[in-house]
C-alpha cells in the first residue's frame, strides 16, 4: 500500500538486481555444464581402462562393420579378444576401439562450445548432441585408421628407420589427429584475424589426453617405450598443425577481402564470411 492506494507488486522491480540474479544463475549453470563435460570424460576413461572386448561391442561392432564394408575383409567376434579376421592375421581388439579419440573429440567439442558461448547461455541439449557427433567422428576416424593398417599389412609396407610398431603408431597419430583437426574446422567459426591461433586449441586437448593423463597415471615408469611414444605424440601433431597453419595463412593472404577488421567482427566459415550470429536468449 502506497499513499493509501494499492501498487502492483511488479511495479517495484529493480532491473539491475534482476540482471545480476540472471547472470549469477547463468554462471552456475555454465559451471555445472563444464563439470558435467569433464566428469563424463573421466568416467568414460575409467570405464575404458577396465573394459573388455565384450563390454566395448557398442563401438567395436559398428567399426568392424564399416571396415568389412570398405576393405572387403571378414571378421568374426571372439569373446574377450575382439573381432578376428578370417585369416587370423588381424584382430580389432580393445586398443583399436578408438575410445581415447572419442574422449578427446568430446572434450574438444564440449569445452570449445562452452568457452565460445559462455556469455550467451547454452541449452543442456548440447551435451547429447556433442556426444553423438564425437561418436560418429570416432567411427569414421577409427574405420579409416584400421583400413589403412590393413592395407599396410597386405602390402607389407616398410619405412626406413621405423619399426613395424613405430609405423603403426605414426599412422595412428596422423589419422587420429588429422581427423581431430578436420572435426574442429567443420564445427568451428574462426575469426578471420586469428584462424591459425585457433588451431592450438585441438592441439592442447590432444596433448592433455594423450600425454597429460598418461603422465598423471605414472606411465612414465615404463621407461623407454613410454618416452618413445611421448616423442612421437609430441612432435608429429605439432608438425601437422604447422603445415595446416601455413596453408590457412597462405589462403588468407591470397584473399585480401577476408581482412575485415575495419568492418567489425566477422567469422570465417570454410572460406565464407558472414556477420556474427545474433545473441540468443538463455534457454
Placement of each model-derived feature along the sequence:
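Acidic/polar hotspots within intrinsically disordered regions
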Residues: 4, 11-13
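Hydrophobic N-terminal alpha-helices or hydrophobic patches in metabolic proteins across all domains
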Residues: 14, 18-283
